[in-house]
Design a protein with these regions (language model features):
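Amphipathic, interaction-prone secondary-structure segments
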Residues: 12-37
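Acidic, aromatic-enriched beta-alpha/helix-loop junctions
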Residues: 30-73
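Negatively charged, low-complexity tracts enriched in Asp/Glu with abundant Ser/Thr
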Residues: 1-16
Length: 88
């Protein structure tokens, strides 16, 4: 499977630790106005809950984020569970 994003695989992204630890799936994605990607679960987060990882690492954890690779700057996508389609 090839890397689907137009950004470099080593692009820094924000990932919540719940996802990194395998406790929760990615349910919310934000492609911020500044180009930063955020991959979060459905919980409230403090700054301590977040970490920087590469875009490739986030993609390796959940390849379904490739379905929203063209999400415009300033837009969000979400889903109720990993079996549901992404909504914007």
């Amino acid at each position: 499977m090839s890397f689907p994003f137009r950004e470099d695989p080593n692009t820094a992204t924000i990932l919540c630790k719940h996802i990194a630890r395998g406790e929760k799936p990615i349910l919310y994605v934000s492609h911020d106005d500044d180009g930063m990607w955020q991959f979060l679960c459905n919980q409230e987060h403090t700054i301590e809950d977040l970490m920087l990882v590469t875009l490739k690492h986030a993609y390796d954890l959940d390849p379904s984020i490739g379905e929203i690779k063209d999400l415009s700057l300033g837009k969000e996508a979400w889903r109720e569970n990993p079996q549901m389609p992404w909504r914007t």
